[in-house]
Amino acid sequence: MDAKIMITSPTTWPSPAKLNLFLYINGRTDNGYHELQTLFQFLDHGDQLTITVNDSGHITLTPDIVDLPVEQNLIWKAANALKKKTGCTLGANIHLNKILPMGGGIGGGSSNAATALVALNFLWQLGLSDDELADIGLKLGADVPVFVRGHAAFAEGVGEKLTPAQPEEKWYLVVRPDVHIATVDIFTHPDLTRNTPKRSLETLLDSEYGNDCEKIVRMIHPKVDKQLSWLLQYAPSRLTGTGSCVFAEFNSRSEAESILAQLSDNVSAFVAQGRNISPLKETLADYLSAQNRPI
């Protein structure tokens, strides 16, 4: 991109949620990490980052998040990791419109980090490839590369082997029970299934989807168990990741919204459609197209 047309006005970027449509644990590596097979799909629902580039050399992030110092925020970490990698001397003001629940298993923090990397790579005109951005992202979190690449993906190994996938783009009712689940507590639980046989993506896509973490989470957290039991009355429903969010799948928006309407007002929930191309990827394409438009 020509530096003479650097965008200095605010730009807004989506930071979409994701679901693990299935999650199977196949074993452990020699260094203790769990080997798994999982299918990521994005949702057309999520946070937003509004970014204004400047020449201050500093990253500012608003608003403040309770109990999360800015230096620990993945957005701030991503922006500064990008500066360190490239030697970029520019800065940015980043405003986060936080919609997704924190710690819900739908990728909020990882998605935020990926959006910061993709957006600032464009706005600062750095020219890094998806592979280079994904490498930076992997140091911030295992799920960040999926969001950077922007395609629904089948993940294997410890999550680092990604194969683009095309699952059906269904409608989902996503519900967040009011509990905090520490991923480490689930993956270290003695009763966690760790020996599910590996299967090909084709076989998995044609099979009933499941989540090996779900049994443990339901056992430890009655609120999750109660919410899943309720959803299962209406549609196929599962845990995403290690939770706490659970989701039910439907063939239409109207079906999902009719069940959403039956939830009490104090339950955190939303309806969204699965997307195999991330809204972030689509927004980047729009900005790139606008830059190439004849003036």
From Swiss-Prot:
Binding site for ATP: P101, M102, G103, G104, G105, I106, G107, G108, G109, S110, S111
Catalytic activity: 4-CDP-2-C-methyl-D-erythritol + ATP = 4-CDP-2-C-methyl-D-erythritol 2-phosphate + ADP + H(+)
GO biological process: isopentenyl diphosphate biosynthetic process, methylerythritol 4-phosphate pathway; terpenoid biosynthetic process
Residues at the active site: K18, D143
Pathway(s) served: Isoprenoid biosynthesis; isopentenyl diphosphate biosynthesis via DXP pathway; isopentenyl diphosphate from 1-deoxy-D-xylulose 5-phosphate: step 3/6
InterPro entries assigned to the protein according to its UniProt record, in alphabetical order: GHMP_kinase_C_dom, GHMP_kinase_C_sf, GHMP_kinase_N_dom, IspE, Ribosomal_Su5_D2-typ_SF, Ribsml_uS5_D2-typ_fold_subgr
GO molecular function: 4-(cytidine 5'-diphospho)-2-C-methyl-D-erythritol kinase activity; ATP binding
Keywords: ATP-binding, Isoprene biosynthesis, Kinase, Nucleotide-binding, Transferase
Top-tier EC class: transferase
Family annotation (Gene3D superfamilies): 3.30.230.10, GHMP kinase, C-terminal domain
One Pfam family linked to the record: GHMP_kinases_N
Entry EC no(s): 2.7.1.148
Family: Belongs to the GHMP kinase family. IspE subfamily.
Function field: Catalyzes the phosphorylation of the position 2 hydroxy group of 4-diphosphocytidyl-2C-methyl-D-erythritol.
HAMAP family in UniProt: IspE
Protein name: 4-diphosphocytidyl-2-C-methyl-D-erythritol kinase
The organism's taxonomic lineage, starting at the top: Bacteria, Pseudomonadati, Pseudomonadota, Gammaproteobacteria, Vibrionales
